[in-house]
Amino acid sequence: MTPKGRRPAALLVSPILPAAGGNGLAMRAGAFLDALAADHDVTLLLVPVAGGGDSADFTRRRVHRLATLPLENDSLDPLYSLGARLLDPAEHLAALRAYPRPAPCRWATSPALEAAVAAAGGARFDTVVVLRSYLAPYAAPFLAGSSWRLLDLDDDERLTLGRLSELYARRGQPERALLAAAEAAKYAVHERAWLPRFDLLLAASEVHEAAIRERHPGLAVSVVPNTVEVPETVRRAPRSPTLRLLFVGNLGYEPNVDAALWIAGELVPRLRRDGSPVELRVAGSHPLPEVVALAGPGITICADPTDLAPHYAWADLALAPIRAGGGTRIKILEAFAAGVPVVATPIGAEGLAVQDGEHLLLADDSNDFATACRRIQGDSLLGARLAANALDRVRESYSRVKGKVILQKLLSRSA
């Protein structure tokens, strides 16, 4: 129990700087930080394996202490370092596949953990919240002294990496396929070792919750959905003869890179075959060179946008042709909240409480995607109905306000 008159102390271990908007992982971290800060003195331990981020003001207003664990070579696991230095490509690949832990765990060494405790001001916290299973080893020194330990599993890394392996194989990238398959297998072992050390596991959807229960019977699991801000009013650009397509995402994340390349390389050319004008905007953080190279006539790459609202206001359709991944897509929820009709793959919409033809249109290949896009473009009533139903669903189930209530109830055990 927390002594009377003292706010409980919480440690949030995050792979990215929390934020109110932008990157989906940063937004989820931001939701956790916001909920924790309401009732706790929060120490944020940033282990920036997913990037540092640029929302320091949002974070500083909510934390008691901000500690960053530098990911430096002197704290790198020597076993990983040895394999990474091999020059022969086959030996290099074999060593990375044989490394026993998931790759993001490679800095979780004794020197790094000692530095983490020092940076956090000690190892005792009433509540410890860890975002992503691969950060669990970095929280090891803090678990024994905590009375309430939560692990957020918003992305199903095993599933994501398995799907990535299949995607790489289809694209003729056997080395990347082998490495992704090896990483997926490592996560299976990693989960068995680390998940039982937490009092409560959190999933982003009922689909992932069921998968966790099946893999790890007896462990406590709850759902914390991804959420977005719902604006009071929705502004849309006037209709145009040009079909305006939008894709939003972290453009350094492989499933999003694959989606952007597919839209520009397959979908847009198919839609333009009849001579109709089509414009595409790809907006997101940290675009890889192959994404930047997509820019051309009618295709705009918007790198690191500070505000996505103008892009959603411009768009006729938001696309989510995701072919790999294991969480729920905040990009779809943002489009719903902005009143933009969505066309997605079944994997893209996986885990969301939505129905094909009621909240969005689902499609699997370029033919089906093109047909769905033209259906919405040619039927304003269909687009309006999908957008209205989707906005209602966000308000009912995925608003930031409702998400905060869910989180605060789960976090209140130590308060």
What kind of region is each of these model predictions?
Residues 81-137, 173-197:
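Conserved nucleotide-sugar donor-binding subdomain of glycosyltransferases
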Residues 199, 299, 310-327, 338-341:
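Acidic donor-binding loop of glycosyltransferase active sites
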Residues 1-71, 123, 139:
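N-terminal subdomain of nucleotide-sugar transferases
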Residues 150-151, 158, 180-188, 192-233:
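Donor nucleotide-sugar binding/catalytic pocket of nucleotide-sugar-dependent glycosyltransferases
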Residues 28, 187, 214, 222-314:
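Conserved catalytic-core segment of nucleotide-activated headgroup transferases in glycan assembly
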